[in-house]
Structures are given as C-alpha cells and as structure tokens.
From Swiss-Prot:
Name of the featured protein: Protein naked cuticle homolog
Annotated keywords: Cell membrane, Cytoplasm, Developmental protein, Membrane, Metal-binding, Nucleus, Wnt signaling pathway
Species: Anopheles gambiae
Limits of the EF-hand domain: 181-216
Organismal lineage: Eukaryota, Metazoa, Ecdysozoa, Arthropoda, Hexapoda
Function, as annotated: Cell autonomous antagonist of the canonical Wnt signaling pathway. May activate a second Wnt signaling pathway that controls planar cell polarity. Required for neuroblast specification.
Length: 886
C-alpha cells in the first residue's frame, strides 16, 4: 500500500504539484499550505494533540520509519531510508526532487494515513519504508527498518499515550527554503494556549502556524511548474515536561530532502517516558541504533550496521552529505537558522548521522536539537572524520567506528537526555563521555567547518544548558558535563557567532534538552511543562548566550512562567466569564463547609471575594454591576426582606434596620438588617444549604428567571428550618437573600440580606430557584426583587421600617407593603404567595419547605412568574431583565 501511495504521490507531484490532502477529512487549507501533499493534521482530534507534531514527526519518523522501517533507527532509517529511499525514488522518480517530494508526500500521506490509521498505516508504512529503505540502503534500510518500526510504534505509542499526556506545547517552527542550495531560514515560535482545557491541539492552532508560515514565505516561494521546491519546515514541540525528541527522523533524508522537497519535520518533543520509551526511546534508540546502528547500543545491528551504516552513511552522506553538506553548508544558514528545530529534529538526525556516521556538518548544524548529539556528531566527525568531517571523507573510519561507538554511547547519554534509555546511556555515557569528550574535542576541530562549528557551538550551548539543566540528571550530567567540556571548546572554536545564532535556536533545543534531561533524570524533569502555556518567547532567540546560563534557570522558570501564565489566563478567563466551575464549586464547598462550621450562631458576615461573585455572575458587566447600585439592591432588599422576615424577625429587623438606616446602605431591606440574628441564622442556614447544594449542582450560577425559579422551587423552603442549622452560610457574609422559591409562590424568598446594613457583607447571598447566590447586592437585585413579593407581610412590616428608611423604592415598597399589610391580599393574588406567607413563618420552622417543594414543583415557574408579576411587577421586570442581563 505504501508503495502505491508513494507512486500515487509521485504522480501527483511529478504530474503537477497539487496540494491536497489524502487522508485528511479535517485538514485545513492553511494546514495544507504547510503540508502541500501531506495531510498536516488528520483532524485535530484529541488523539491528534501532538499528532500535528506527532504527525509531522511521524511524517519524519513514521514516514522515515516507514521508509526505513526498523526498530532502532527511526531517525536514522528515516534519514537513511528516506535518504536511500529518496535516492531509490530519485531513481524511480523523474527528478530526485520530485522523488523526494514524492517520498515526502508519500511519507506525508503515510503519516496522514498513519495518523488516521496509526497501526495499520504504520505497519504498511513500516513495510513500505522498510522495503524502500532496504532497497535504498540495505544496511541503512535494515537498521533503519528496525529503527523505523520502533519509531512508528513509538510514534503510535506516543500518539496513543500522547492524547493522555499530550499537552499543547510550544511549537518552534523553523522553515527554510532551499533555493538552489541556499537555505532561507525563517524561525517562528508559536505558543499555544490550552484555554479550553482540552489540552489538545486544534486544527486552528496548526492552521495559525501554517498561515503564519505561509504569510511569511508562501508568497516568496516559487515552485517550478510541475516541479518541486523543498521547504524544510521543522516543527518542534517543546516537550510537555518531557524531553523533546527530535523525531524528524531523517538526517540523511533531510539532506536528501534538502533537495527540493517539502519537509515538515516535527520533533516529537513529547518524549513519553512511557510511550516515548517506544517512541522516544525508539527514536533515541533509533538514534542510538542508527547512530550506533552498529554501536551495540542496541547491540542488534550495532557494530556491523554501524560499520556498514557508518561506511554507507559516511559514503552516502559523504555523497549526500557532500551535496547535503554543501546544501547544509549552503543551507547551513538555514540549518543554523532553523538549526534549533532542525537541531532538535536533527538530534535524531545527528543520531542518524552518528549511526550514519554521516555529515556532522549538514546534520551537525541541525544537531542543535541534540547539541550533545552534535557534539557526538562532531565526535563522529572526529572519529568518523566527519564521517569525514562533512561526510566528505572518512578520515578516521576505524577510530570513527570506535569513537563512533563510544560517541554513540555518548549520544545515548544524550539520548538519555532525549529519552529514557538512561541505563544504557548511563552505562555508555561514562565511557562515551570520555570518548565523546575526546571525539568532541577532536571533532570540533574536525567539524571546525562553519556548519559543524556552529553545530558544535550549538552543541556546546545545548550541552551547557543540558549540563546545567541536565546536571540534576545523573546519567545525562556526566556525558553532558563531558560534552559540555568538549563542546565548550566548540563554541570557542570560532563557532561563537554561529553558536549565538544557533544558541538562540538551540536555546530552545537546549532548554528542551536540559528540561528533558532534568525531566528524564529528575522528578523535576517529570514535572510537565505547562502544556498549553509553553511560551515560545522563553526560547527567545535573543538572550542566546544568556540562555546558556539561563537555560538551566529557564528549565525551572519556564514552568513557573507557564504557571503564572496559566493563572493570568485563568483570571482573564474568569473575567471573561470563562469561569472555572471546579474552582467555583470548591469555593462553594468551602463556603458551605464554613457555614456549617459556624452554623450554630449567626456567623459574622463574610464578604465573598469579588472573584467568587464574578464567577457566580460571570455575565455581569462592570457597568451592570455598578448599575445595580447597592442602593437599588438595598431597595429591593428592603422591599423583599420584610416579606420573608417573620414579625418577630421584623422587630429584630427593625432594630437591624435602624442600625442599617444609619448605615449608608439604607435601602438595603435585607432581612439581615431587619431580621434578628436568629432569622439571619435561618436564612443563613437556608443559604448555606442552598449554596452548598448549588455549589455542587449549579456551579455556574445561572440567573435566568426560569433556571433560578426552577432551582428556587426545588430548594425554596429547604433551609428555612436549616437556618437553625446553617446560619453559617450567612457567614459568607453576603447579606443573604433567599430568593428562591422556597415556594413557587414565594420563589423570591429573600434570605436575610444579612449585613448589608452591617457593612461587613456587601455581598448578598441570594437564593433564587433554590440557587443560593453569593453576589453583591447589585448583582442580587434581580433575585431579590423576585423574592420581595414572596414575603409581603413580613416585608410589609419590614418595609414599613424600610420605607421609613427608604423612599426610593416607595412604589415597590408600597406594593410590597400592600402585600405585607394584607398578607391575605397578596396571598389571594398569589395562592402560592398565601402559602408562601403561611410557609414563611412555618418555613422557618421548616414546614414551608415541604410546601414550597410541592408547590414549587407544581407551579414553580409559572407560579413564581405569576406571583412575581402580581406582587412585584417592576421588580419582576427588573429581575426579568437583570437575570437576562446577568
């Protein structure tokens, strides 16, 4: 199938390069812009979280793995397989570019399909890639095949695991156009924020990335008619607290790809300690195997493959590395520019390079992702003589093999940074460290070539970062320190300028590497980076040198920054009515608990935090909140609270009112003002119960009339007896207005607005529709208004006091007052109200509760509305408007 796909893509590309996605139902145009023939994202489904990166990685890794299906050499195999595969397809395809593109498209399609059909596609790709890789390069293909299989499996595993562990991550997109052999590097840093909490990358996210790239380079890129142009796009995803594995699994392919071909290489930065063991380790193992394909890291094809691969790879990469090396030299700027991402991807490539023993120069610069690898790569260069420096000559093949093995080990130690092969790497990196130090030191001069130097400097930078960041990593640290020591010469080797450039890019890679190393080696390393809040700017290209020193700190800071960002975003989200209900619920539970704790006596009113209120009333604009002035709220409360307040309470309330009257908030009719503390306790209990219940039931206090009323009808009466139990709810200090509907007739039962007069509680806890609401009196206006009429008689007396206090709500007050005076009158108007009054008194006794429940269920909404209209038209209208507003 893979062969057919490749052929199909070949024809598509050669027959006229058409950008369309094969298996992408959900692909976006922008995505397709980036991935011309590839399905960039196979639908941003949760499994696709990193699938975009995974997909890209898979394109690299899987396609390369498919191309070079192997267990240990995903990158190597991708590189070799692709490299060879591309060569094979070069032979097959009219043009190597077309072939490469075709191969890329094939890989893309494979990845797409693979992405959609991870297993079957992987197998098919694996087979196809294996065949191709095998055909292209027996040794590389074989080793690659092994690596590719692992990589594919790894990718699959990673993809499988990633949905669980995938986090939006920082995407560093290095786009390089190769015009002639000159790369035109561009770097983009995309920070994706998981604002919706699903932790998945959406097509829009990728589309934005693609759009950015397209806008940056799309218009400037001219693709020959029926020809192909290679756009090397490396998409690296900073690991979610996991090492960034460079799964662009093709150094050789990359080189081959350097030929016109669209490469979208995404590093699988999610080195799953779990799934990545397969994927990351496989890439790493693949790198190790690839790099050490003979390096006996896996001991499988290690030595033979290494010799063969190194020889072949050296030769091939000397071939390609020559032309790639030239490309890489020509594209060294590109590599350097995109070196960070590429280095990350090329970390795998370097692994490949190591296993290939190939071009440190071309891949070396791209080794940035794995500066250690780069150092190792350079080590390979030294031992491998660059795989002869640029793969240009096998300077020291025997030493290269030996050093290469040692370097492989070192690289494995690097992989330890990159992956969980810590044991082998630990074992190996000790010996390898020495070798790699030596080889790195030697290879640095060998790779003193600008590209390699920059790579080396990059490696040094990353090594520093890794060493700094990886220092916690015992395994990585020795190799890192060793590499660091060696690498330090590299940057000092006159690579400093490039090192700075790369360092900028490498900083991210080094950060990632260091972070990965730390994460890998430490629990701190395990500390996932805030998934959605990875800030690409932390990896600013500036502070390149500072990054080396800061890399370690950044490893720590990045999480802190992300956490801060998360908090900031969360706050903004809350402000934007994107309240986190779990938090709100927690708050409510806390409040309820506190209320329960203090229920025995009227708790001291406690103001609810504005944050709580905002969460509860996410929709209220500041204007609305302000508009609902406390005076208005107090007016409503004044009208309403008397209704709820029993006459005994009225007396207390009068006292409270008198107190309240002196209070600036005269209007606050809150029963709390008027109501004696015992009444407050009643209502507090009611409120606390309702709130606790609401906290659980309706985290988002929805204040629509219907919902509130419905809730109220359910919970109206509930806490009247409870007030004895949980006056502590009042402790929330919000003058509590139980608006709600203990009884449908009194849906707007006003819980005592406990101390609006007191002043401690500016917040009113409204119980509307049995939904206790902690809110400012202004916010509670609507609910309070509705509850006014529910307690006409009680409020009548209260209102008398309140009216004395307030004239502003005179009409309403009179209206309520009227209801209060002839409680029977208001009751006849609303039989429910009648019941409500009967219940109001019993309701505090708890009898009203059952009644309100029954009536609530029966007439809940209609009764409430009717009652409200009859008793508080203006209030009702306000309520009607305000709840809608709120």
């Amino acid at each position: 199938m893979a062969g057919n796909i490749v052929k199909w893509w070949k024809h598509k590309i050669l027959g006229g390069y058409k950008q369309f996605t094969v298996l992408q139902e959900c692909a976006t145009d922008s995505e397709e812009l980036i991935y011309p023939g590839r399905a960039p994202s196979a639908c941003s489904a949760p499994p696709d979280l990193l699938l975009t990166s995974d997909r890209e990685q898979m394109l690299k890794v899987k396609s390369s793995a498919s191309t070079g299906s192997g267990t240990g050499q995903t990158k190597t195999s991708f590189q070799h397989s692709h490299h060879h595969h591309h060569h094979g397809h070069h032979h097959q395809s009219p043009s190597s570019n077309g072939h490469n593109h075709s191969g890329t498209s094939h890989q893309q399609q494979q990845q797409q399909q693979h992405h959609h059909h991870h297993k079957s596609q992987k197998d098919a790709f694996r087979k196809c890639t294996n065949g191709k890789a095998g055909g292209g390069n027996a040794t590389a293909g074989g080793a690659s095949g092994a690596g590719a299989t692992n990589t594919i499996n790894t990718t699959a595993a990673t993809i499988r695991s990633d949905p669980d562990r995938v986090r939006l991550e920082e995407f560093t997109c290095d786009v390089s156009l190769e015009d002639g052999k000159k790369p035109q590097p561009l770097q983009f840093s995309f920070t994706l924020y998981d604002l919706d909490g699903h932790g998945k990358i959406t097509k829009d996210d990728i589309a934005g990335i693609v759009s950015t790239i397209y806008e940056s380079i799309g218009k400037s890129v001219v693709v020959p008619h029926y020809g192909s142009k290679t756009i090397n796009v490396r998409l690296t995803v900073s690991p979610d607290g996991k090492t960034a594995t460079t799964k662009p699994a093709s150094a050789a392919v990359k080189k081959a790809i350097i030929t016109p071909r669209r490469r979208y290489r995404s590093r699988k930065l999610i080195s799953d300690d779990d799934g990545s063991d397969t994927s990351e380790n496989c890439p790493r193992l693949l790198r190790n195997r690839t790099a050490a394909t003979a390096v006996t890291n896996n001991g499988e094809t290690a030595n033979n493959n290494q010799a063969a691969l190194q020889n072949q790879q050296q030769q091939q990469q000397q071939q390609h590395h020559h032309h790639h090396h030239h490309h890489s030299n020509g594209s060294s700027g590109k590599l350097k520019e995109s070196n960070l991402s590429k280095a990350t991807a090329l970390a795998g490539d370097n692994q490949v390079n190591r296993s290939i023993g190939l071009s440190n120069s071309s891949e070396g610069s791209s080794a940035v992702g794995q500066l250690l690898v780069e150092a190792y790569h350079k080590n390979n260069l030294s031992p491998g003589a660059a795989n002869a420096g640029a793969g240009k000559g096998v300077l020291n093949n025997a030493p290269n093999a030996t050093k290469s093995k040692a370097n492989e080990n070192v690289y494995e130690s690097i992989n330890n940074l990159k992956c969980c092969n810590l044991q082998q790497q630990q074992q190996q990196h000790t010996a390898s460290n020495n070798t790699s130090l030596q080889t790195t030191a030697s290879s640095l001069p060998v790779t003193a070539t600008g590209l390699n130097q920059s790579t080396t400097s990059t490696a040094a930078l990353i090594c520093h970062d890794c060493v700094d960041g990886g220092a916690p990593t015992t395994t990585l640290l020795p190799p890192l320190s060793t590499l660091e020591t060696v690498v330090i010469p590299a940057p000092s080797a006159g690579v400093t300028g490039r090192a700075k450039r790369k360092l900028v890019r490498k900083t991210r890679a080094s950060r990632k590497t260091a972070i990965a190393a730390k994460m890998m080696s430490e629990d701190f390393a395990r500390r996932p980076r805030a998934r959605s809040l990875s800030v690409g700017n932390e990896n600013c290209y500036e502070n390149v040198i500072g990054r080396m020193a800061a890399a370690q700190e950044e490893c720590w800071k990045s999480s802190l920054c992300r956490r801060e960002l998360i908090e900031i975003i969360r706050e903004s989200m809350v402000k934007n009515s994107l309240c986190f209900q779990p938090n709100r619920r927690k708050e409510h539970h806390r409040l309820a608990a506190a209320v329960g704790a203090t229920r025995s006596t009227q708790p001291t009113p406690v103001k609810l935090s504005t944050a709580l209120l905002n969460q509860q009333y996410p929709n209220l604009s500041a204007e609305q909140k302000l508009t609902r002035s406390i005076n208005q709220v107090e007016q409503w409360l004044d009208h309403r609270s008397p209704k709820l307040v029993p006459k005994v309470k009225l007396a207390d309330d009068m006292q409270l009112q008198r107190t309240v009257v002196s209070r600036p908030l005269k209007r606050s009719k809150s029963k709390e003002e008027l109501t004696p503390s015992n009444l407050l306790l009643l209502e507090n209990l009611k409120i606390s119960e309702d709130i606790a219940e609401i906290a659980v039931v309706t985290p988002k206090k929805v204040y629509n009339k219907e919902s509130l009323i419905a809730s109220a009808t359910k919970k109206n009466i509930k806490t009247h007896h409870q007030h004895q139990h949980s006056p502590s709810r009042q402790p929330t200090a919000v003058p509590t207005v139980a608006i709600g509907a203990e009884k449908p007739s009194a849906p707007l039962t006003v819980v005592n607005k406990q101390s609006i007069p007191v002043g401690d509680a500016q917040l009113v806890q409204l119980q509307y529709g049995s939904v206790p609401i902690n809110a400012d009196p202004s916010e509670c206006e609507n609910l309070i208004r509705m509850s006014d009429d529910g307690e006409d008689v009680e409020q009548h007396q209260h209102q008398q006091h309140q009216q004395q206090q307030q004239t502003a709500p005179m009409a309403a007050t009179k209206h309520s007052y009227r209801h209060h005076q002839p409680q029977s009158r208001s009751q006849p108007q609303s039989p429910q109200h009648h019941q409500h009054h009967h219940q109001q008194e019993p309701r505090y006794c708890g009898s009203g509760r059952a009644h309100s429940v029954s009536s609530a269920s029966a007439a809940s909404t209609t009764a409430v509305h009717r009652y409200v209209h009859e008793h508080i038209h203006h209030h009702y209208h306000h309520f009607e408007n305000d709840p809608d507003e709120s």
